[in-house]
Each structure stands twice: as C-alpha cells, then as structure tokens.
Amino acid sequence: MLAIALPSYPISNFRPGRLLALAALLSVPLCAHAGRAYVTNEDGESVSVLDTDKAEVVSTINVGKRPRGLKLSRDGRELYVAVSGLPKCPPSVPDEECAKLKRDLTADGIAVIDTATLKLVRLLKSGSDPEQFDLSHDGKRLFISNEDSGTLTVVNVRTGAVETTVAVGREPEGVRLSPDARWIIVTSESGNAIYVIDAHSLKVVKSIAVGKRPRDVAFSPDSKTVYISGEFDASVFTTKIPDSDGATKLIQLRTEDKPMGLIFDAPRNRLFVSTGRRGAIAVVSIEGPKLEAEIPVGARPWGIALSRDGKRLYSANGSSNDVTIVDTTTLQVVKKIAVGKSPWGVVLDDRRG
C-alpha cells in the first residue's frame, strides 16, 4: 500500500499550482505493487505469490482443498480460486470406485483473496467440484464448471448468490467467455464435446462433438473461431461460432502429448499448448497450420499464462513442483521457480501504475 503524507497547513494557504501538484500526487494508484504471478498448488492446498520482477516466491496463501482454476478481478483487487472437497480421481479409476471416495462438499466453492493483504476473505458457493471458470467482462459474474455434477454455475460476485445453473456434459472443465461477451464455451471431458451457451439468455445453443477428452478453450480476437485441446488424441481442434455444427482437427501433435492449457497469441497468430506428461509447451502456427517449436519446461505442464506485453509465457508444472518462464521471442526457458506441491494453474497481474 502506498502511503501519502499530506501537508499540515490550512487549505487556504494553497496556491493553484500547489493544488494541481497535490491532485497529481493523489492520482497515484494506492494499490500499486510489483508485477505478480499467482499459482495454485493442488496438493499443497495453497497459492504461491511470485514477484515477476525478481522471479521469486514472496508469499504463500493457504486457500482450501484442491485449488485449481484461478482468475483476477478486473481491477486486480481480488483473486478468485476454485477449491474442491472431492479427492483426486484420475481417468484410469472406474467411476464406481471414484464414487466411493470420501468428499467434503463444504469445501467446494470459489475462494476470494484480497490481493492487498493476501488474505482469504470469503468463499463463494458453487456446484460440486468446481474446476475452471471465467469472469464476465463487467466483473459481476463468475461462470463456473462443476466437474462432479456436470453443470455450469453462474454466481453473482458481490452477493455470492447462485443466479442460475446450466446442465452441460459430463465432467465439464474448460470455460471461456468470448471477447465480445456473446458466447460461453464449456468443454465436456467425458462427453467428448463442447457446449455453446448464449451469454445473454444463459441457455445452451448447441453441443459440438470434439475429439477425445477436450480440456481447454481459446477464442480468436474476433470471437468467431474457437480452439480446443484434445487430451486423449493429442490434437488441437477448431470450430466456428455460432454457425458450425462440427469441429475439425487443426493439428495433430506427437502421440505422447496430452494437450491441456491453451493460449492464443494474437499478434503472432499462434497457439501455446501445454502437453501434460510430455513435459513441453507446443507452439502452433495457425498459418499452415504447423508446429513451430516444442519447449521443454518441466514435468506435466498444465496451466499457462501470457504476460500483457506478450514477451513472457508462464507454465505451471504439476509433477516438478515449479513454474517455468519462457521468452516468447527466442522460445527459450529463462527461469524456473520452485513453488508448492502440484502446481495446477497460473494467472498474472502485470499492470503497472
């Protein structure tokens, strides 16, 4: 927090020039801080706070069980983190065995952290086993995928009220609001489909079959093209919204790849794709399309984030318990930072002043 010492003499003594200088001083943001990255540690039940200038961990926040998806509020004053009381159950475990695992439904929700104090201030309730979510452009609503219940929950950020619940496919994960705020896309892992939701009516418009186990979604800047990672067929798919009723394979990656996180790098017209157990970030040029590069980053990269200026890519590496920073011009690793246990997602706050 930035403290400002005000003059102690009477306001009548101020000249116009002094008043203008004081006004300029008071316009300095009161919450200015160094650039930060926030990283969820799924098995560590915490969020690591990184100073991106120094490339080091400066704080750790205990946040709740199984923190995964995370987003910053539009003004950067709050950090939202999806937490879940449902134990891990990988795809190799039968559904009937997963159903026997002990769960704590009271732990489910979206944890809200004050970024000035780095304290947990409240828990917004959602559906069962929230995993990923997106934030409305006005910052008033969260759109939350609930993996266990096959639903999308719409939550009012201010009141905490659940405004509506939308049935989607089995094991929803990726959630993305289009840049024009017209569409919400939700991936259904087990349903091998994406669901297209009208963001105004909050009704499902259609579902589109997409490969095997779609995980994450990215939009083109014009909101017309959607890119989807297909984990079990090592591919990236694409479709047109809202007209298309099908998806096409954009590119086939290596068979050992397990695509998860997606980011569209608009200035360079390319995608960054985390490949899970393959331990790399795939760089895919939309032109062609073609595989530009593969960047080894760590064990099981999952969530990824791109800096505001597009110069740095951050990768949360779940099995090596670290975050990797990549120079997006040279496509070389510039730094690795140890964080908590099983980092899952990362989000950046690199606004200045």
Model-inferred region functions:
Residues 4-21:
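Bacterial N-terminal signal peptides that target proteins for export
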Residues 25-353:
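Predominantly soluble domains enriched in secretory-pathway, periplasmic, or organellar proteins
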